[in-house]
From Swiss-Prot:
Coiled coil: none annotated. K(+) binds at N240, T259, V261, T264. This is tRNA modification GTPase MnmE. Disulfide bonds: none annotated. (6S)-5-formyl-5,6,7,8-tetrahydrofolate binds at R36, E94, K133, K478. NCBIfam families: mnmE_trmE_thdF, PRK05291.1-3, small_GTP. It comes from Psychrobacter cryohalolentis (strain ATCC BAA-1226 / DSM 17306 / VKM B-2378 / K5). Homodimer. Heterotetramer of two MnmE and two MnmG subunits. It is found in: Cytoplasm. The lineage of its organism: Bacteria, Pseudomonadati, Pseudomonadota, Gammaproteobacteria, Moraxellales.
Amino acid sequence: MALAAPESSKNLGLSSLPTIAAIATPLGRGGVGVIRLSGTHAYSIACTLTGKSAFKPRMASFCRFYQADGTVIDEGLVLYFKGPHSFTGEDVIELQGHGGMILQNQLLARVFELGAKQASAGEFSYRAFDNDKLDLVQAEAIADAIDATSAAAASSAIRSLSGEFSQKINQLLEQLIHLRLHVEAAIDFPDEEDVDFLSDGVIQGKLEQTQEKIQQVLATAKQGQLLRDGIHVVLAGRPNAGKSSLLNRLAGQERAIVTDVAGTTRDTLQETVVLNGLTLHLTDTAGLRETEDTVERIGIERARTAIAQADMLLMVYDVTRDLEEESTPLQLAEQLFGELPEAKRLLIIANKSDLLNNNSSKEITSISQQEIHNRGYEQVNVSCETGAGIDDLVETLCAKVGFHPPENSLIARTRHLDALRRTAEYLAEAHEQLTVFKAGELVAESLRQAQHSLGEITGEFSADDLLGKIFGSFCIGK
């Protein structure tokens, strides 16, 4: 359930917002189940539920949880976090009972009877954001830590949650604010010699320093986005080229059926793996060819859809048979895909390279590789049978998408990259207005737009529909 334009405690006052509750642990059978409450009435609900008159903040209390008629629902621990010293900034109660959906649902129903409302997806985190306990980057990092598919992604998300990414953005915002102050002062007081920024070079130097730092943060964010999202890789080629065998090699297990019969793979098959720290969302596809088989034809249509949506294409071909006389891998790619994909999006995989056992075949392959290199493409020779070349393939793939995660990488999202790019564009405009046109008012406006774009990252400038979309993607109970 999406969180649509949540009401702000800053507008309504904390006491006007309903007390919310939700199961905070995963659904299903478990040793412990946690129900979280947040709001003005969380404390009184806990007292009524347990028959206790008081709870000490940050102290665990063993209690029984009662129905209205005195029947015991469950027993467990109550933790009380008094606002504003809590995750949400409000009074927060955690009820830790036994796991299992029957007991959890009975306990949650009783909490609702006592006046709490069902929390929307991400509503606890939204209240933390709304009460300045988290900025938007930190709030997103909670979801990213939960959804991390690799150890590197998880540790990067925790660094973002601790505020490292936000600190970089806030430092840049502070620089932009100082730049704007100097520029606008020069506009307002044009007769003052000490603010003649159009000719003294001071503002230009500060602007160029800010541009350089934006590019540094953007480079870090690109790595963070790759860590978070990974890349979607489609394996494509003719039937029996070795696509399914390559998927199995990369996955480290027999995920796809492999036979000598052409057309064995008739549908797309997805597998997610983490190699060299990069998450690869792999899709094996039906071999591309003309066919009268209805089922295979549907599989080929799905393959072409996957190809169109892929971040990276691995065109797998059998070096012993797939290249017709005088044809090259690039010509084969053009035949298979209808047009030659961009070099940054295509990696050519020469399978069964271990079977090149005569000089003429090796010479043809060498000539093909030279043509591939001259046109800016890359080919990796592999053997899916022996595993030779697979490590080279992974390293080449990581390099091709620009994945070189630094030790202290920070998780980032597509919207962060978009905001940073727009900020860089506005700064470039400001630089041009300053150095070419000497137009102070236009410099100030470009800097204002740059500040606004950068502020979107931490939530300083964010529309309600954006906030609803972000927090609506969270788990219930977060």
